Amino acid sequence: MEKVMLSFDKVSAHYGKIQALHEVSLHINQGEIVTLIGANGAGKTTLLGTLCGDPRATSGRIVFDDKDITDWQTAKIMREAVAIVPEGRRVFSRMTVEENLAMGGFFAERDQFQERIKWVYELFPRLHERRIQRAGTMSGGEQQMLAIGRALMSNPRLLLLDEPSLGLAPIIIQQIFDTIEQLREQGMTIFLVEQNANQALKLADRGYVLENGHVVLSDTGDALLANEAVRSAYLGG
């Protein structure tokens, strides 16, 4: 039987008096890529934020690795082998590539740190080439590689990706998605939040569709790609 790594059970969340999530239920099995698609303002980023403790769930339960983390502080959740690549990359622009990666591996022992940085450079040879370059002078695609690499330095078992293709050229998007596929092959569990529904669903084992804070559909990636309502709303017909 597949092990459930993450589950939301009827989770609601609010910003002040505005309800952003409405009794959302979903799960991610160990080793899966699960994608969440939806239009701008559907609540995708809020859902990731709620998983990370900000905003807090106002009702329901969030369970990670058999632990109820609903009321945990963000820092405690992040130390529980969860890492997020935020929308907009948010690299430390005045730091070099290597310094950014060091921030991601801040809690690693020296031997672990060296192993992880070697692994990140193997995934992203461009980062090794640019390791002494300031992050702020890099292209958007290189910054996205760095943001993913920085998250991987904490050796997560669950990687959260928030709109990794946003603002990138198609050739770079393909490289990023190829790397996500590689990570899955290495056993990582990935929760991918994407507006690029076509690419995301091709890659995903399963997917959820979020509309106005409600999960309205869930199925395999292939089934959602073939679904006429999904094609019409998110795949340009």
UniProtKB/Swiss-Prot annotation:
ATP binds at residues 38-45. Keywords: Amino-acid transport, ATP-binding, Nucleotide-binding, Transport. GO terms for biological process: branched-chain amino acid transport; isoleucine transmembrane transport; L-amino acid transport; L-valine transmembrane transport; phenylalanine transport. One of its GO terms (molecular function) is ATP binding. It comes from the Bacteria. Residues 6-237 form the ABC transporter domain. This is High-affinity branched-chain amino acid transport ATP-binding protein LivF. It comes from Escherichia coli (strain K12). The gene is livF.
